[in-house]
Amino acid sequence: MAESHIMSSEAPPKSNTGLNIRTNCRMILNLLREKDCSVTFSPEQPLTPVTDLAVGFSNLSTFSGETPKRCLDLSNLGDETAPLPTESPDRMSSGKLESPKTQFVQFDGLFTPDLAWKAKKCPKRNMNSVLPHLLCSTPSFKKASGGQRSLSNKENEGELFKNPNCKPVALLLPQEVVDSQLSPTPENKVDISLEEDCEMNILGSPISADPPCLDGAHDDIKMQNLDGFADFFSVDEEEMENPPGAVGNLSCSMAILLSGPLLNQDVEISNVNNISLNRSRLYRSPSMPEKLDRPMLKRPVRPLDSETPVRVKRRRSTSSPLQPEEENCQPQRRGTSLKKTLSLCDVDISTVLDEDCGHRQLIGDFSKVYALPTVTGRHQDLRYITGETLAALMHGDFNSLVEKFFIIDCRYPYEYDGGHIKSAFNLHRQEEVTDYFLQQPLTPLMVQKRLIIIFHCEFSSERGPKMCRFLREEDRASNDYPSLYYPELYLLKGGYKDFFPEYKELCEPQSYCPMHHQDFREDLLKFRTKCKTSVGDRKRREQVARLMKL
């Protein structure tokens, strides 16, 4: 009877609160104590941890009238207002508290008659609101309603404290107090203990999804044991489904990312091409697809249209504006054109090569061309003649040009004795060549005719070319450049080995003895040793002569 009288005398609340069942029960106990109602519990009970915490809240600076040490948060002024808890009018009128054990905060209008239909509308999910839900967003403080004090004086009001937007953890009362005050029957004790177990299981994770729904039979039992407090659970369910702080704290861009559709990677390339090419690519979004096979040039393929400006020239004229002119049209001559001077860059490379070839066709003193036809051979710096040319020379076909010719056989004496070309001289040592040609140089009787020297060995590969170069070097050293005693020197291509099979009649004796003959091994070693010694002596003599000149 006392409970019904209190509930009828209280004014309806201006807005719903977010406190759970245990906090509501504690507030009801405080109201019963202040109204001096008869309750079957001893006033001398010891303070429980929850009661001690409530006493500590009452001694805060917000209840003593001092200015709280907290900056005013104006970030969520646009949110929906929530009622602020106040103390009882009786307690505010009296300047002191009666007893620390009975000092609790009173909430105006804990029950709302118009919320009964909400509990009937969704009875199954009313039980889910009993379990605590912890929101991860920053709590935003709500404004006071029209019946309360203005928000501008909120910090200077000592009897008020700020109600956070997030759901507070339920304040647990001791089991003995609950049994003695709220549940005189065994049924209520069992229900509250079951409720406490469910709440402790949910508190295992601070961030959790909606708890699993209970079956229908268990919901009916819980709704019967709520003793008329089902309205609070419907209010909690609505606030859990639509939390005002969680949506308010999200920015516009974050809300678009969470609610918008996922980007599709298969975007048409034509949409990407619409982007400006001049835009910087340094900060391109990673989600935007990029065309990998884009052309490197602006126009990789030249159009085939003949009327494009690419195929038309424009000639600038001082007397007339620009006029297009076809490429195939011949340009008009403007007066007398100056002749460009000849430079090395304008000379054709072929002309240079021809001049080089012309110089190579000249004899050693660059006065005349070679009298005999030459061919290319192994050594590019020497002039070669064939066996046919030598045979023609021996037959007198070049008597009009050649006054006298010398055939020098550079083979060893045993090779020369085994078979040689007619009228050939055997000079296999450098000293012999020097003594024969340079001590008393030979000159032609007629200036118009030539003096020719032809070298050869077995293959004309080593000994013949070496002797030819030696004579040219000694001749250069004995004369002033480019004068020479013997400007025309030749090599027989293929040597005696190729000449003998074709022209045996020009050889005497008509035989051929190779250098590595089995019968002349000792002679080969002896002549090689003499040649090496003579070469060493010659080098020493040259060094002495150079030192004497210094």
UniProtKB/Swiss-Prot annotation:
Its EC number is 3.1.3.48. GO terms for molecular function: phosphoprotein phosphatase activity; protein tyrosine phosphatase activity. CDD domains: Cdc25. Residues 76-98, 285-335 are annotated as: Disordered. It holds the Pfam family Rhodanese. InterPro entries: MPI_Phosphatase, Rhodanese-like_dom, Rhodanese-like_dom_sf. The active site is at residue 457. It catalyses: O-phospho-L-tyrosyl-[protein] + H2O = L-tyrosyl-[protein] + phosphate. It comes from the Eukaryota. Keywords: Cell cycle, Cell division, Hydrolase, Mitosis, Protein phosphatase. Residues 290-310 have a biased composition (Basic and acidic residues). Residues 401-508 form the Rhodanese domain. GO terms for cellular component: cytoplasm; nucleus. GO terms for biological process: cell division; G2/M transition of mitotic cell cycle; positive regulation of G2/M transition of mitotic cell cycle; positive regulation of G2/MI transition of meiotic cell cycle. SMART domains: RHOD. Signal peptide: none annotated. Disulfide bonds: none annotated. Belongs to the MPI phosphatase family. Tyrosine protein phosphatase which functions as a dosage-dependent inducer of mitotic progression. Directly dephosphorylates CDK1 and stimulates its kinase activity. This is M-phase inducer phosphatase 1-A. It comes from Xenopus laevis (African clawed frog). The gene is cdc25-1-a.
